[in-house]
Amino acid sequence: PLRRQRQMCIRDRNYTMLFDKEKHAALWVAYPLHSCYRGNSGRTEAWAADPLIEMLYQAKVYGETFCYYKDYSRGHQIPSADRTATDELNSQTFYASNMTPQNGDFNGGIWASLEGKIRENMCQDTLYVVTGCYFGNGYTTTYDGYYGNNADPASKICPVPTHYFKVVLRTRSGNSGKAVGQCGSDELKAIGFWLEHRNDYPQTFSTEYCKSVEYIEQQTGFTFFPSVPKEVKKQCTPSDWVL
């Protein structure tokens, strides 16, 4: 019951998220990825509060000035580059609810590299992605509401994730024309990625970060792709993917 009180699911846009009011962040963001969502609008930089969530629960990291304290970037969970078909779609990725305090080198390095790898696996069928953050034991904290070295009087403590993850699912052929629910287990492929939140990764992506969806479910306690057969979620075959 307590978890239900502090968490809320947002479904009324082109992605779905589970937002945690105490963490001031989404624990996961789920979204379809297809060419219909990508175009030439580019980054709107439309940093704003999420209109579907009370502002007191959101990190104050919106507007042109407000950021997290010190070395933390405003890290997207659904990437801006995954929603460039229209300015409206792109602007929704800049809501504060989609941000977490992310180390700048991690954000612009290994995480950006992984985001690019995910896009390389787009196909005629839809690619399904869930991006999330995990707060392990001993997580640190930062503050929101900073502009330069100055803090807003209403600045809040914001937990910093210890890990980030992605799980992805698509048809093997990429052009089956079938919904996932119409596919047998031999027609689907899935994989996950689990990264410790630190700043000393090499710039290039490595398959050592690959895990099964089942592994990430065990780490986080969440169930992803609930209608998909278990044998698909046990897969961890990097050679099946463009990585």
Model-predicted segments: where are they?
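Short, His- and charge-rich active-site/binding loops that engage polyanionic ligands
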Residues: 13-77
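Domain-level detector of nuclease and nuclease-like folds
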Residues: 57-243
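Generic preference for hydrophobic
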Residues: 8-9, 30, 129
